[in-house]
Each structure stands twice: as structure tokens, then as C-alpha cells.
Amino acid sequence: MASRDLPHSLNDLAFGWIKHLKEEIIINKNSQQLVDEDFQPDEDVTKETKVKLNNLWPAFASGAGLFADGYVNNSIGIVMACLKILYGDEFTKSNAISNIGSIGFVGTVVGQLSFGYISDRVARKGGMMTANIMLIAFTLLCAVGSWGTTIQGFFACLTVWRFCLGVAIGAEYPTSSVIASEFANQLPAGKRNRYFIWFTGFMIDFGFVVSAFVPFVLLWIFTEKHLRALWRVSIGLGAILPTALFFIRLKMKDSTSFEKLHMKNVRYRDYPWWLIVKFYWFRLTIVSMIWFIYNFSVYSFGTFNAIILGQIIPDAPLWQQWGWSVVFNLFYIPGSFLGAFSADYLGPRLTLAIGVGLQGIIGFIMSACLNGLRKQVAAFTVVFGIFATLGEFGPGGNIGLLASKTSATPIRGQYYGIAAAMGKIGAFVGTWIFPAIQRRYASKTNPDLELQVPFYLSSGLCIFSALLTFFLCPHVGQDAINREDKEFVEYLRKNGFDVSKLGEDSSSVDVDVVKDTDSAEKISETIEVGQKLA
């Protein structure tokens, strides 16, 4: 096994991270220093010094599709609430109530893993466009679909389309996020991380907020007498942004780094599977564990929403419940927005560790003081808001950034897809484990215990995740993608893989040149010259 990421001694484990701080922390560097230190394998490439609109729009167009992940996933909660009111015991006592939620996780994992492979081995842009079409189609089918004339047939129909929609959402992760990271890499050093997070993780959080606000407004329009129309329109509106993005994405091209380094032309039997596993097994394990723990813990953190709502509005009408849902979702926005800046100034590794570590500490305090906080609703709401903000400040935005920048371009889709899938599996496991823990510790003498125990567990996992990130996660500098591509190609070459098989035309494109630029015309001219000489 390759051991480049493994600590080679106890001293290396405890203090090895110190030597990389100067690459991660740039808060004390001016723009000229960042330009000078920015690693570019191709000396002819002009380093960007300003953020230009023509460099921003491909990153936005690719990453913004994740808005649907936040919007549609949160909208399903609204759907479930409406179905409970509309159908009562016929819904709550059927398998549909668990199937609709669980099947979405399964579909998302299938989409993440399958399209991770498609993104690397078949077509990166093609995979993104396919995911886009699926997202539009299955969102609309969830909104309007039915099956026969019976209620159970309708529940079965919704379950099937929810699975398909999950596949489409999962497909967006290893296609659009990966493309966004490669285009964000062509921005000036010192500003790359923030734009990636704003166009990916922030879009998910924005989707959560909009999905809470839309049904709140629709409730004013339709009233509680027309909940069927309300939930269908609410879901259907989720297809608007993907439809707009589809036409924008049509004009996009694959990033230059992917064109130069992809392995689409490598036959399956020649594909260096074992070399890839040896090179990435450890860091992929660490990134996947961090993502798993974060999503696993999020479920128990959400239980405190119910406590606050129960104290503020115990018998409130539906519009008040949904209004407070908007408030809770708004807590995510400042965390994700500020975390994007910190990801540039402190680096994503340190930002994630600080955010999730502080979240764990506050989680312990909230759990220990639960009985007192119940009586101070305003204080409870503020503390919970800070708590939720820290979650998005740290892992919420930065875990995807770490997954995209700790892997090389030829395998980034599969690497990202596996890590993201582990995160969704963590969320799925959490939905089953924490209710079981709550039932186990339910007590009439101490009613707080059933909430404190899972919260203590999740907070402890947050601290563990912070330690994993701090001591074992690879450091990520501004030029991490460029350096990782170069190291990976050199590793393949040294281990006997024919690197001339990489990219579109290895006879004319230097595989060491991995910087994303918009110099497509220069590349085309180089290819033509190479073909004439051949």
C-alpha cells in the first residue's frame, strides 16, 4: 500500500500538520504573494489576478444544480406533513411513511456511485446533462404522478418516483460538483475555495431555505383546505432552476484539465485500479468517515427543532409551524457564507475542524443544560442557531471541497461519489439508529434523557470528526488540484502505467499541464500542429 498520507511516527502524527500551515493559511499574504506561490506546471499559463465573469459562470452553472438537493429533499418533509393531514391513519400506519423517506436515500447513493463512474469513464459533461434531465423529469413526476385510483397505488407511485428523483439528485454530486471544482480552479489564488462553496454547499442550504419559504407562501394562497394543490405545486417549482441551468449548461465544455488527463480511452483491463486504490485508500477513508459522521449526527441535531417548536407554539396552526421552519433553516445561511471565506483564509481542513469541534462543544453544553434551556426559549433558540451555523461553517460547506481537492482529475468523480455516498449512508443510518436510542432511553422519571443521550453521542462524534480532520486529513492549499494532478501522473508513470493514454491527444498535449484555463483555441492549434508533424 502507498503510504504518503499515513503518519510515519507518533511525532509526525502529533506535529506533522504544522509544516503545512503556511500553505493553508493565507490571511497574512497579499495578492501578489499568492500569485507568486501559485503552482502552475505550465510556465506559459498566465496566472489570473482578478475574478472575471466568464470564469465564474461555468462554476456557477455546474454547481448550482445542488440547489435541487436542498430544495427537493426538504420539500419531501412538507409533502409528508401534508399527507399525514390529508390521509391520517391510512398514511401514518402504512409502509409508505417510511418507504418514501428511506427510498430517497437509496436512490441518492445509487446516483452518486453510478454517476461517479460515468463522470470519469464515459462523459463528465454528458453525465451532468443526463442528471439534469432526470432531475427535471422526476421532480415533475413526483409532483403530478399517480398510479391507479387507490390511495395505496398513489403511495406506491410516489415511492417509485422518489427513488428515481434520489438517483437524479445523487448524480449531481459527482458530476456538477466535480466540474465546479475544476472551473473554480481557474480563478485567482486566494478566492477559489469561497466560490466553490458558494456555488455548491451554499446552494444546498439556499435550497433548504427556499423550500421552507415556498410552502409557507403557498399556504397563504391555497389555505389549509387545498393541501393537495399546495404540496404538488411546492415540489413542482423545484424543476424551475434545473430547467434554466439545462440551457446554460448546453454551452459548457469539459474543463481543460479533464480533457488533458481523463482516462476515457483506457480499456477496462488496462485501467490502473490497484494503483489508484493504493494511492488514495487512506485519504478517501478519512474524508468518507468525516462525511459519514457529519450526516449521521445531523439527524439527532434536528430533534431539538421539535423541542423549541413545542415550547413556543405547542398547539400552533400549520402556518406558524412552517414559519418557524423558515427561521430554523435561515440559521444555515450565515454559516455557509462565512465558512466559504474561512476556507480561503484558513484552508478547508482547519475550517472544518474548527467548525465541527465548536459544534460538538456547544452540543455537550446544550444537552447538559437541556432542562434549563427548555424554560428559556429565546436563549435556547439563539444557542441552537449558533450551533446550526457552526455545522455549516465547518463540514456543511467544506467536506465537499475537501473531497474535490484531495483527488486527481482522472478519478475525481469516482472519489467524490464514494465519499458523498458514505455521507448519505450515514444520514440513512442515523434515521434508524437515533429513534431506537430514544426509545431505549425513554423515561417517565427523566423525560430529557431520551434526547440527551443521542445528542451526547452526536456531539462526541463531532469532536472525534474534528480530531480526524485535524490530524489525519490531508492539507489543502490554493493550488491543491494542480499539485495533486501532477503527483498522480508522476505516480502512475513511476509504476509502469502508460501515461500517453491520458487525455484526448497525448501526442500534442503535455500531461503535466493540468491548470484549467480558457485557452481552448491554443490547445486546438497545438493539436493541429502535432497532427501535421505526425
UniProtKB/Swiss-Prot annotation:
Its main location: membrane. Pfam families: Sugar_tr. Disruption phenotype: Triple deletion of GIT2, GIT3 and GIT4 impairs the uptake of glycerophosphocholine (GroPCho) and reduces virulence in a mouse model of blood stream infection. It is a multi-pass membrane protein. Keywords: Cell membrane, Membrane, Transmembrane, Transmembrane helix, Transport, Virulence. This is Glycerophosphodiester transporter GIT2. Probable glycerophosphodiester transporter. Does not possess detectable glycerophosphoinositol (GroPIns) transport activity. Might be involved in the uptake of glycerophosphocholine (GroPCho). The expanded ability to utilize GroPIns and GroPCho results from the organism's pathogenic nature and its need to occupy a variety of environments within its host organism. This possibility is buttressed by the fact that GroPIns and GroPCho are present and abundant in human fluids. GO terms for biological process: organic anion transport. The chain crosses the membrane at residues 63-83, 96-116, 135-155, 163-183, 202-222, 230-250, 289-309, 322-342, 350-370, 377-397, 417-437, 453-473. One of its GO terms (molecular function) is transmembrane transporter activity. Induction: In contrast to the other glycerophosphodiester transporters, expression is largely unresponsive to phosphate levels.
